[in-house]
Regions:
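Short Pro/Gly-enriched beta-strand edge/turn motifs at strand-loop
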Residues: 406-408
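Non-catalytic cap/lid and distal C-terminal segments of serine-dependent acyl enzymes
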Residues: 2-57, 61-395, 400-404, 417-433, ...
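Surface-exposed, proline-enriched loop/turn segments that connect beta strands in immunoglobulin-like
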Residues: 21, 410-412
Length: 454
C-alpha cells in the first residue's frame, strides 16, 4: 500500500484481500487497478453509478491464474459507488470496500483530491462516535443513531449544542461516518479552532410504518425526530437545550427532510443546511416565515443544474425579503465530495451567538415494541444495517414537477420464517442460474420467482 495514502481514504467496515491482491488499488499517479478472482467466469466488468464514475462498463482482462484485472489511468478524484458484473450479473464484491447505499451493501473506493485533506485522519485529538438505540413511535421498531461527541466530552461536564445531520436516499445512519467522514471533519475543524464544539446526531431517516407505501418524504420522520430522537439525546447526553442550540442539515433526501422539518418547526431550530437540495423550492417557506433563522446554508455541485438554478431563485427571494442566506457551489455532481465540503463550510457558521436555553421539546412519545419484533431485529442485525430497509427508489414527479419518488419493497436476501425455514432470494435478471453456498460446502440451487421478474 502507498504509505503516503491517508487512512481515511480506506476506512470501510469490511475489506479483505483475495488471492493476495486487493480488489481496488489506487496508485500514486492516479491510476486505479481493479481485480477480481473468478476462475469460472468468462466476462468480468466494473461500472459506476454516474457522475465522475459513469455507468459505462469497463472490461477486466484475465490474468491466466483465475483472476481478472483492469488498470484505468487518471481516475477522477472522489468517493465512488460502483458495481461488479460477472458474466452480466451485477454483484457486490465481498472482498472490496463496502458501505451502505442504494438500500443495500455496495462497493466503494476513493481517489484523493489533490491538496484536500480536511477529512483526513490526523494526529490530533479525536472525538467519539457512539451507536445508540431508541424506539420509534412511528414504526414501533428499535432503531439506531450515530452520535459524535467532541474530544474531552467524557472527562468534562460541559454541555454542547447539537446538529442533527441526515443522509441521502438509499443510505442510512452509517453514511455520514463511513462515506462522509463527518467525525474526522469535525475533529479537524475543532482542532483548528474553526467551529464551536458540538454534538452531531446522525439517524436513519426512514420512518416507514409496516405496509406503508410512502412517497418522497419517507414516512413521518418529523415526528420520530421531535418526539423520539431529540428527547433521547437531551436525556442521555449533556446538551444545551433550546432553539438557539439546535440545528438541522442533510444531503439530497436528507436536505428535503431538513427543509421540511425546519420550515414546520422554526421555533425549535436556529439553522438549516441544505446540501444538494432536491426540494429546494420548499426553502420559500423558510423565507416567508415570520421567524428568522440564524443560518441558512445551501449548496450543490456544479453539474447539478436544476438544483443550482433553484438555489439562485431562492437566494434572490431571500435578498428581496431583506433576509440573509449563504449559497455555495462546488465542483462535482450529486456525490459525497460535494457534501463533505458542504459540511466543512456549514459547521463553522453554527452556534456563534449566545442564546437562551429553553426546554422546548414536547414530551417523549413512547411506543411498545413487541417481543417478536425485537427477536427479528436481533437476528437481522448486521455491521451496516441494524433495522434494514428493504426498499428501492423509483424517481417520479408530481403534477407540479416536484420530486415524488416512491419506495417499492424488495425481497430480503434471506428471511427466516416462524417455522425456522430459510428463504433465500437474489435479484439477478441476467443470470442463467443462481446457487447459494451453505456453510461453504452444500450448494442450493435457486429457482426463478414467477411473481417477481428478475
Amino acid at each position: 500500500m502507498n504509505e503516503k495514502r491517508n487512512g481515511a481514504l480506506d476506512r470501510y467496515p469490511i475489506e479483505k484481500k483475495r488471492a493476495g491482491r486487493p480488489s481496488v488499488t489506487v496508485k500514486e499517479d492516479g491510476a486505479v487497478i481493479f481485480y477480481l478472482y473468478a476462475p469460472a467466469a468468462k466476462i468480468v466488468q466494473v461500472a459506476g453509478l454516474g457522475g465522475y464514475f459513469t455507468n459505462k462498463k469497463i472490461d477486466l482482462m484475465p490474468d491466466g491464474q483465475g483472476g481478472f484485472f483492469a488498470e484505468v489511468q487518471d481516475f477522477h478524484w472522489g468517493m465512488h459507488y460502483y458495481f461488479w458484473y460477472v458474466d452480466g450479473v451485477r454483484i457486490c464484491n465481498p472482498y472490496a470496500g463496502i458501505s451502505y447505499g442504494c438500500f443495500a451493501a455496495i462497493n466503494t473506493f476513493e481517489v484523493q483530491e489533490k491538496n484536500v485533506d480536511f477529512y483526513f485522519a490526523k494526529d490530533i485529538p479525536h472525538g467519539t462516535v457512539s451507536i445508540c438505540k431508541y424506539v420509534s413511535e412511528v414504526s414501533s421498531h428499535l432503531k439506531e443513531c450515530y452520535v459524535y461527541t467532541p474530544y474531552g466530552y467524557e472527562e468534562g461536564d460541559e454541555r454542547y449544542p447539537v446538529l442533527y445531520l441526515q443522509h441521502g436516499v438509499g443510505e442510512n445512519e452509517t453514511g455520514w461516518i463511513w462515506q462522509g467522514k463527518a467525525n474526522l471533519i469535525m475533529d479537524c475543524l475543532i482542532a483548528e479552532g474553526k467551529c464551536e464544539k458540538m454534538i452531531v446526531v446522525m439517524s436513519s431517516g426512514y420512518a416507514f410504518k409496516d405496509g406503508e407505501k410512502p412517497v418522497f418524504y419517507p414516512g413521518n420522520f418529523e415526528s420520530e425526530l421531535i418526539h423520539n430522537i431529540i428527547p433521547y439525546i437531551e436525556k442521555n447526553f449533556r446538551v444545551r437545550k433550546g432553539r438557539d442550540y439546535r440545528a438541522m442539515a442533510g444531503l439530497s433526501l436528507g436536505s428535503a427532510q431538513a427543509t421540511d422539518i425546519v420550515a414546520k418547526n422554526m421555533k425549535l431550530f436556529s439553522a438549516a443546511g441544505v446540501f444538494s437540495g432536491v426540494a429546494i423550492h420548499e426553502m420559500e417557506r423558510i423565507c416567508d416565515s415570520d421567524e428568522q433563522l440564524d443560518v441558512v446554508f445551501m449548496s450543490c455541485g456544479t453539474y447539478e443544474e436544476q438544483i443550482r438554478e433553484g438555489m439562485e431563485q431562492i437566494e434572490q427571494k431571500f435578498e428581496n425579503a431583506g433576509k440573509y442566506c449563504i449559497s455555495k457551489v462546488y465542483e462535482g455532481y450529486h456525490e459525497w465530495h460535494v457534501w463533505r465540503k458542504s459540511l466543512y463550510d456549514f459547521v463553522p457558521l453554527l452556534f456563534r451567538k449566545a442564546g437562551a436555553e429553553t426546554d422546548d421539546i414536547p414530551g417523549e412519545r413512547t411506543a411498545r415494541i413487541t417481543r417478536q419484533r425485537l427477536q427479528r431485529q436481533t437476528m437481522e442485525e448486521q455491521i451496516l444495517m441494524f433495522d434494514p430497509v428493504y426498499r428501492q427508489i423509483r424517481f417520479e414527479t408530481d403534477e407540479a414537477g416536484r420530486p415524488a419518488g416512491k419506495y417499492p419493497d424488495i425481497p430480503h436476501g434471506i428471511c427466516i420464517t416462524e417455522q425456522g425455514t430459510a428463504v433465500v432470494c437474489f435479484e439477478a435478471p441476467e443470470a442463467v442460474s443462481v446457487e447459494a453456498a451453505l456453510d461453504g460446502k452444500e450448494f442450493l440451487k435457486l429457482r426463478k420467482d414467477q411473481e417477481r421478474q428478475g
